[in-house]
């Protein structure tokens, strides 16, 4: 069974538009979790393909300083994974949601219960950056009969054989990491990045999205030329926190309506 997220993003790719997925931190809002759907609606109205929702955690190994601070603000409001899932169960969204979390919160929640409860939301994808592919059986047996795709991350340092292993049988999309290190770094791209992304996109049979360090309209243009779209996190999180909703809407509209 082809999962909803795969079909949804593939349809956008087939329409010759760039896929655009913004990242937000759940609970990082003046209203806490009560403002979550306000932010989601703002992004939906700007035409996004899907929305990545971050789960705050005390040791976010893949997060750069902007997203880490957002997580700390959310944790200070006593936002938990349980509370986030309950909030997401209240209302269906127009576009698929993708949860980005770490192993420990899922383990503490209970893996089977986590997948079961997510199935009652609009979440169609799951990213766990500290879950090695060798240990994916931690959760894949529970996802197999669900409509939730486990999204693999592929970095520049990933060897060809390893890339093929990650890509084969992957669902949802391939998360291509544009820089070595944490989210939010900009301008530190390797010279062979475009070639790496082009090769990855040519080999994969599901959409390839470029993330980590993507923050400008020029980045959107560049990475849409060598992959199927982009994920933007730190810029969105920072601008939302600074109250720049109009600026966010304009930027997201540009990325969401980019024609190939």
UniProtKB/Swiss-Prot annotation:
Regions that span the bilayer: none
Location of the active site: 52, 63
Pathway: Amino-acid biosynthesis; L-tryptophan biosynthesis; L-tryptophan from chorismate: step 5/5
Keyword Lyase: yes
Domain of life: Bacteria
GO CC, one annotated term: cytosol
InterPro entries named in the record: Aldolase_TIM, RibuloseP-bd_barrel, Trp_synthase_alpha_AS, Trp_synthase_suA
Enzymatic reactions: (1S,2R)-1-C-(indol-3-yl)glycerol 3-phosphate + L-serine = D-glyceraldehyde 3-phosphate + L-tryptophan + H2O
Alphabetical UniProt keywords: Amino-acid biosynthesis, Aromatic amino acid biosynthesis, Lyase, Tryptophan biosynthesis
EC number from the UniProt entry: 4.2.1.20
GO molecular function, one term: tryptophan synthase activity
Family according to the record: Belongs to the TrpA family.
Quaternary assembly: Tetramer of two alpha and two beta chains.
Functional note: The alpha subunit is responsible for the aldol cleavage of indoleglycerol phosphate to indole and glyceraldehyde 3-phosphate.
Protein name: Tryptophan synthase alpha chain
Organism of origin: Streptococcus thermophilus (strain CNRZ 1066)
Lineage: Bacteria, Bacillati, Bacillota, Bacilli, Lactobacillales
């Amino acid at each position: 069974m082809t999962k909803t997220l795969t079909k949804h993003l593939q349809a956008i790719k087939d329409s010759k538009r760039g896929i655009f997925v913004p990242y937000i931190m759940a609970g990082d809002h003046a209203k806490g979790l009560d403002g979550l759907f306000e932010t989601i609606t703002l992004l939906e109205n700007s035409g996004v393909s899907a929305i990545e929702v971050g789960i705050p955690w005390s040791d976010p190994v893949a997060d750069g300083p902007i997203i880490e601070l957002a997580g700390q603000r959310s944790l200070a409001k006593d936002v938990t994974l349980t509370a986030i899932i309950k909030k997401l169960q209240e209302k269906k969204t127009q576009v698929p949601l993708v949860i980005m979390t770490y192993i420990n919160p899922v383990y503490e929640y209970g893996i089977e219960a986590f997948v079961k409860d997510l199935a009652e939301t609009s979440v169609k994808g799951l990213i766990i950056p500290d879950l090695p592919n060798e240990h994916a059986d931690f959760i894949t047996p529970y996802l197999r009969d669900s409509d939730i795709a486990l999204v693999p991350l592929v970095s520049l340092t990933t060897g060809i054989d390893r890339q093929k292993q990650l890509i084969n049988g992957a669902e949802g999309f391939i998360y291509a990491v544009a820089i070595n290190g944490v989210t939010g770094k900009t301008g530190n791209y390797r010279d062979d990045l475009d070639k790496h992304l082009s090769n990855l996109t040519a080999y994969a049979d599901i959409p390839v999205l470029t993330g980590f360090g993507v923050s400008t309209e020029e980045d959107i243009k560049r990475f849409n030329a060598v992959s199927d779209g982009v994920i933007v996190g730190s810029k969105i999180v920072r601008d939302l926190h600074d109250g720049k909703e109009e600026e966010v809407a304009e930027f997201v509209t540009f990325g969401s309506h980019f024609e190939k």
